[in-house]
Amino acid sequence: MGESARGGGSAETTGGLAAAVKTYLEYTPTGESIPAAAWRRRHRNVRVFVLAHIPLLLALGLYEGTESAVTGATIPPTPGILIAAELGIVGALVGLASIPSVSRRGRTALASTAVLASSVVLVQFSGGFIEAHFHFFVGMAVIAVYEDWLPFALGLVYVVFTHGVFGMINAERVYNHTAAINNPWVWGGIHGAFVLLLAGALMANWYSTERSREASQKRLEEARQKAQQVEDLEARQAEIEAEKAEAKRLKADAEEAREAAEAQQREVAALNERLEATANTYGAAMARAADGDLSVRLDPDVENDAMAAIAASFNEMLDETETTIREIQAVASDVAAASEDADAGVVEIEDASGQVSETVQEIAAGADEQREKLETVSGEMTDLSAAIEEVAASADSVAERSHETAAVAGDGEQTAEQAIADSRTVQSAVESTVQNVEALDDQLAEISEIVDLISDVAEQTNMLALNANIEAARADKSGDGFAVVADEVKDLAEETRASAGDIEALVADIDAQMQATVTEARTADESVQDAISAVDAVVDAFGTVAENAEETDTGVQEISTTTDDQAASTEEAVSMIAEVSDISTATAADAQQASTAAEQQTTAAATISENTAALREQADRLQGLVSTFDVHDESASTAARSE
């Protein structure tokens, strides 16, 4: 029984321990509870903290010897390559921790490693002073701002690993006492244990803080929920009060609506009574109108719009009916009077119709005689028109020939003017040729002078060659070569003089030919000038011919036009005479028809007389019928409507 109890207690203890461990792990911070803005601010401060170490560590690494002013510590020398490498590693870690694309925990790990690396560099550059190891604990406190267990785990591993490894490589730069120098891994573990204890203490504090924070959050959330419930209750109470006020308002509106309905019911009853009285009055008036009293009217000044509209429409109908009856009465009177007048007029028509018939027969006989005379005139006018047309045709032919003459004269004048232009071009060319030949003559004179100069030079060269031969003869054998050259020069001079003579003769021939050319050109120029004068005379003659031909053409054209107009007028007169003849024929026929119509009119007048008598009887009956209706006087009715 006791063993069972102990077994149960052991199980409870084991279960409680597991629950405690689970709870501890749940509240182990990971840094995720820190807001992003706060985390960025803390991360920036950690990086600034590490970067502030670099100039101090550089100064410590470069220092060598015993510092006697304050500490009395002896600092060993540090190779420059080691200083650069280790400070470069610290700076690189800070740079990597600043890259935004790296995850948040990745940058946390890099910044924490940079802090611990600066602690390692401080210990090495100081020569392993135990006081420098305190910087590890400072670094652990700094990275605690991340509130994450990962930096602590990195710190623990980093402290043990660096103390053990660097203690094996150069223990004197890590530790400054013999025990640690001889056992670097043991003392590295001791440092790690202290770091672990520090981390445990901080994490225990975080655990308590997280528990307190969670409890505070729960209480705050509960307070918020209660405040929200209070606000909801207050809002609900306000809604209830509003609903009560709305219910009271609706009740008051219902009372007002009931009272209004009762009042409206009373008004409807009174209105029905007034409508019934108005309907009785309207019925009596309509009965009088049905009996023929068209002067009766309904009173439109009533309360009901429909009854007022009925009264207005009925009054308007009676106004129109009364006006119509009044007009019928007037028309009946007018018809009776007109019937009497028509009866008297019909008698006069019968007498006039006989006279018209006789007159029309006389007109028909005159129209036949006029037609015969017009036919004779039309034949004579036709012959005259044919003669005028022959004259017009001859005038057209003459006009066409005169027009052709004027055109030929114009073409001849243009051709003569073109010949003058061509002659002037030839004259310009001849003058240019004369000028060119004269210029060539001047150049030949210059060539002649040059040939004379060449002849003089050849003569002088010949004299020099002769003198050279004389000098060569005097020089005996030594002048043989000189004599040969002198002979060649002499021969060349002779050839030059001969060529100059030929050129001079040729220039003389050319000069003679050019003189002849100039003479012929001047003669041609004079001939061209004479031709231009002759052609000018021809142009003037053609101009005169063209003007005369144009005047002739104009006159003939006017004659032709006048003749055409006469022919057209004659044809038009013939046509008009034919039309007059046709009109005379038609007039005779119409006169015959008018005579027949006059006879028919006489017969119709008798019929009209009979119909007029019947119409007078109908008008009397109509007056008797409309006299049964009572209507207002027209002037009085108009005055009443205007009012």
UniProtKB/Swiss-Prot annotation:
Covalent S-S links between cysteines: none
Domain HAMP: 273-326
Signal peptide: none
Keywords noted in UniProt: Cell membrane, Chemotaxis, Membrane, Transducer, Transmembrane, Transmembrane helix
UniProt topology in membrane: Multi-pass membrane protein
Bilayer-spanning residue ranges: 48-68, 79-99, 115-134, 149-169, 184-204
Processing and modification events after translation: Methylated by CheR.
Pfam families (alphabetical): MCPsignal (PF00015)
Domain of life: Archaea
InterPro entries: Chemotax_Me-accpt_rcpt, HAMP_dom, MCPsignal_dom
Annotated family: Belongs to the methyl-accepting chemotaxis (MCP) protein family.
Protein name: Transducer protein Htr8
Organism: Halobacterium salinarum (strain ATCC 29341 / DSM 671 / R1)
